[in-house]
Amino acid sequence: MVCASSDLYENVSDMHILVQGYEWGPGVPKIILQLKEEVSSVSANAGSVTTAGQARTVTDIYTCDANGQKTEGASDYIAIEMATSSQNAGSPLVYDGAALHYKWADTYPVKVECPQLVVDGENYTYSASVDCIDKQICPDTERFSARDAFTGTYLNSFTGEEEEMTLHTIAYEPESLAGGEKNPLVIWLHGQWEGGEDPDITLLGNEACALARDEIQNYFTAGNETGAYVLSIQCETFWMDEGDGTNGLGSGISKYTEILMDTIARYVESNTDVDPNRIYLGGASNGGYMTVNMLVNYPDYFAAAFPCCEAYSFYEFGRNANGSYKIDASAGYSLQAVELTGNRWMTDEKIEAIKNVPMWFTLAINDGTVFPKAFGLPTYQALVQAGADNCWLSVFENVVGTDDPAASYAGHSVWVYLFNNQITGVQDRDKIVAAADDNFGVVPTNAGGGTLSADGHSNLYEWLNAQSK
């Protein structure tokens, strides 16, 4: 029986937020109250919750463990679960317009007002306001337990001077793989918004943390072992930074090219459980550019690559006398804003150098950020016309979510399909080889990105697992 009294509930010792990776970025689906003493049951009949100034809809309240997982029986934690969508996620990340990166919010105020909290049959009121920016629980990033940085001095070809550079790394190293078979390594290169000095952001900004979840890990095998190492690497500016500190246009060489190779090599050398013949490189947007850039510069190192919405330009863009790109701001964000020199940046020599590397490209035909007809499509066509026979392309019509089925994302966000494990089909290479117009022979489809299979494999990850030097 519920008592008529409504005393102030004073059994709460602390409050945390659960941060989770979603297809749109991080969200906060739960508030976790740490208690001074265990309770067996809890419910709430009314109340309100706001996180970071947004009103949230409470969907459930229950006893839980320290990570917010529902428990049966007594516990010294209570979870307040909230509806979470792309429009109301309560993200603790904010976009820094000056740096062109995500960063953690300076504060994350959480306010809970509960006039009818029922705990073990007793009626209470509960009210609290807590800044939770430093009170985060995030299993999605905590499983990436190996954090490091690599610093070295390299020639900046733009300035002509030596420059000290640092790359930050974060790795998923499952204990179940240690000491047995040599296992594959999946390397992830982030997009523009995830640069900086906190590699956790590379996992949450676009759900790269999914690479360590069972659904994807289960595709990777070595002998009787299941799983892969995952290494996410973060640069402090942009992978497309050619040395002037700006986000380049993709027809140049990244200033991070050498240090990235050294960072990868050091990780592989220091982790003897990694199979050097099964190193898979992938990235999206800026990271897709860098994936192709690394193949061009180190074509014999990687066993396979999976660039998404890659921004390595097929064409060479004109430059000013100081080396910066010529851009006509009056033309807006379009190909008309840049000057084409008439030369190719993805030359025949580069195509020949990388055509034997197993590759799987993914893009959405409505990408309005990295235009497919100037980047991924002509590059892919040149590869298959040159005889690349283990090179695949998935093309989607647009980007629709599953974490939030009502959400429709910008066409550039095709990594949503990658991390949702929805890249299952490929385009017809013969039609692309024969195409003579700017449609490149592709037939976009949201049913896996294509109607054919890649050498009989069911999806990108199964194909990736089969690749070895």
Locate predicted features.
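A domain-start/cap signature at the N-terminus of enzymes
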Residues: V2-K30, G53-N183
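A short glycine/threonine-centered beta-strand motif
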Residues: G27-A44
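Short, solvent-exposed loop/turn and secondary-structure capping segments
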Residues: S91-L93, E181-K182, G196-L204, D241-G248, ...
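Gly/Ser-rich "nucleophile elbow"/oxyanion-hole loop immediately N-terminal to the catalytic nucleophile
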Residues: G180-E181, G243-S285
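Active-site machinery of serine-nucleophile hydrolases
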Residues: L185, Q192-E258
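Mobile cap/lid helix-loop segments that gate and shape the active-site cleft of serine hydrolases
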Residues: T202-Q217, M290, M294-V357, S453-D455, ...
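C-terminal catalytic histidine-bearing segment of alpha/beta-hydrolase fold enzymes
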Residues: W360-K469
